[in-house]
Amino acid sequence: MAKKYALFIALILVVSYFSLTSGSFSVRPAELLSTLFQIDPNPQYEILLFDLRLPRVVMAAIIGLGLGIAGAVIQAITRNGLADPGILGINAGAGAGIVAFMLLFQGQKEVTSIAAAMGMPLFGLIGGLIAAILIYIFAWHRGNLDSGRIILVGIAINSGFSALSLFLSLKMDPQDYQMAMVWKNGSIWSANWTYITAVLPWMLLFIPILIGKSRLLDTIRFDEDTVRSLGISSNKEKTILLVACVAIISACVSVAGSMAFVGLIAPHISRRLAGVEHRYILPLSGLIGMLLVISADFAGKLFFQPAEVPAGIILAILGVPYFLYLLFKQKKGENA
């Protein structure tokens, strides 16, 4: 596994390098190193790298890490390889909470104060938790959380919260509405060190909790009777895991909008490479998620100059065919 981790870390570093040096204003390798390590740095390059490009790369890495790990956990909880935070409605719930924040505090999305940056993840957490609670209420069947119902309920909740977000967005003034639309499409254009400072504690708190539950996740993938026979309170553990996932997803959505399909694609690739043990799946899912989001942000920035396509749209272009492929593959397996 160490070689696989090293491979993806190397790929992340390569894409990050090109993201830092490429664009409308290119940076040579020597200038990049001298600026990053403060060896006779050029003030122009300092502004370009430390204020504009480096925050985007760091933010993309944090978001990819969080969504990749959260997606793997959600797939384990639901025992469904097609589960994804976006499909389940958690992204939409968190998004509705953050749109409400933007409506209540007009223009606060651009405020760089730490108070405003901290407020958005909290509103997102409230929205995400409401979505998760509704999933629990409607997916609860015969004293247990029905893994099959979770997906159907999640799709309905996703539609409901998306409609609510649109309704709230229409109440904004034109400038804030335009900002909200760009954000909802999954954009990292507004990344800055304040938002990184705001989202990082959520990752440092909840990701270790999920990784610490790796052995439990290996057990939860069995049927409910087997889990109960091992003396594990399945519903209690699922609740803890789901709350941790919602917190991570809400923090990611608050600073970058909806990054669809990261939580679907990364765990699938990870399971193919790492097998069935979650102590390997979760870290690898995080690394793959980092690579996906950094690459999508870089592609949207580079290939459509002078315009810029949000990373969320690039990920959706990749994710929809992959989702249909998995759906076809699952259906084919059931008919075999």
UniProtKB/Swiss-Prot annotation:
Alphabetical list of InterPro entries matching this protein: ABC_BtuC-like, ABC_transptr_permease_BtuC
CDD domains membership: TM_ABC_iron-siderophores_like
One GO BP annotation of this record: siderophore-dependent iron import into cell
UniProt xrefs under Gene3D superfamilies: ABC transporter involved in vitamin B12 uptake, BtuC
Principal location: membrane
Topology in the lipid bilayer: Multi-pass membrane protein
Quaternary structure, from the entry: The complex is composed of one ATP-binding protein (YusV), two transmembrane proteins (FeuB and FeuC) and a solute-binding protein (FeuA).
Swiss-Prot/TrEMBL induction comment: Induced by Btr in iron-limited conditions.
Pfam families xref list: FecCD
Stretches assigned to coiled coil: none
Protein's job: Involved in the uptake of iron. Probably responsible for the translocation of the substrate across the membrane.
Compartment(s) of residence: Cell membrane
Keyword Protein biosynthesis on entry: no
Superkingdom to which the source organism belongs: Bacteria
Source species of the chain: Bacillus subtilis (strain 168)
GO molecular function: transmembrane transporter activity
Encoding gene, per UniProt annotation: feuC
PANTHER family: FERRIC ENTEROBACTIN TRANSPORT SYSTEM PERMEASE PROTEIN, IRON-UPTAKE SYSTEM PERMEASE PROTEIN FEUC
Name of this protein: Iron-uptake system permease protein FeuC
CC terms in the record's Gene Ontology section: plasma membrane
Transmembrane segments: 7-27, 57-77, 85-105, 120-140, 150-170, 191-211, 246-266, 280-300, 308-328
Keyword annotations from UniProtKB, A to Z: Cell membrane, Ion transport, Iron, Iron transport, Membrane, Transmembrane, Transmembrane helix, Transport
Family, similarity comment: Belongs to the binding-protein-dependent transport system permease family. FecCD subfamily.
